[in-house]
């Protein structure tokens, strides 16, 4: 079943059309309702609507009213707002990417669900974790597949947020562009110092030499640098990490 809503347009109770994207922004197409406006042109050709200044004002007004309603709900009844968030989240984030004014109004009311299913704003994510990883927000896009890392984060008292929607990657890239010092890092992107412990120089040297030789033979490569770190959690025998930059580049190449 389609989740697309229906906005019917009328001019003095005369039906014109429905779901005209020049009037209803694409990211608000899940809305349902009626607009009756005597100033709407009866000619609904695309070119006519695109060149009609009043139509643009109506579109901006609808966007503003939706942003005001959602931000107001978040301010006055955040618990109720959270009930809707998982369903509306992709549309709000898409709207923030498409519409600068909508983004300005909604940026403080975009929520992120953490590992304990608690909803936090962008600012709250940074504030709650500034003592352990300032200006870094860790995230998981698959808590089940990345459960080993999730458990390690929980054991060390380090928080992360869940970002499972396709829109999340371009959205967090936009947030990073607007907040130059902030980085989103997937929980399997690197081995945080909190998850390692120091070992003696002799032990480190011995382990590095043995593992380097092992991997050179296995990969059939004479030139290979191996960095060895001891994982604090004895239940974890090894970890595979890919830097955030490399992984995002790989994801872009797949698109």
Residue ranges and their predicted role:
Residues 1-255:
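Conserved GHKL (Bergerat-fold) ATPase module
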């Amino acid at each position: 079943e389609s989740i697309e809503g229906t906005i019917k347009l009328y001019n003095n109770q005369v039906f014109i059309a429905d779901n005209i994207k020049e009037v209803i922004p694409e990211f608000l197409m899940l809305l349902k309702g009626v607009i009756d406006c005597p100033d709407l042109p009866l000619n609904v050709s695309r070119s006519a609507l695109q060149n009609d200044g009043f139509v643009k004002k109506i579109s901006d007004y609808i966007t503003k009213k939706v942003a005001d309603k959602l931000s107001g709900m978040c301010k006055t009844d955040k618990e109720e707002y959270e009930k809707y968030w998982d369903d509306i989240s992709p549309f709000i984030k898409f709207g923030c990417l498409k519409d600068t004014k909508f983004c300005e109004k909604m940026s403080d009311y975009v929520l992120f669900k953490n590992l304990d299913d608690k909803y936090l704003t962008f600012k709250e994510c940074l504030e709650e974790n500034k003592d352990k990883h300032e200006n870094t927000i860790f995230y998981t896009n698959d808590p089940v597949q990345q459960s080993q890392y999730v458990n390690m984060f929980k054991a060390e008292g380090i928080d992360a947020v869940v970002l499972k929607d396709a829109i999340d990657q371009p959205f967090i890239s936009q947030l990073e562009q607007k907040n130059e010092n902030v980085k989103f890092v997937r929980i399997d992107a690197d081995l945080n110092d909190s998850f390692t412990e120091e070992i003696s120089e002799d032990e480190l040297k011995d382990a590095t030499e043995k593992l380097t030789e092992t991997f050179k033979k296995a990969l059939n490569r004479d030139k290979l640098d191996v960095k060895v770190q001891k994982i604090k959690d004895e239940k974890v025998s090894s970890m595979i990490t890919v830097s955030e930059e490399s992984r995002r580049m790989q994801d872009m190449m797949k698109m």
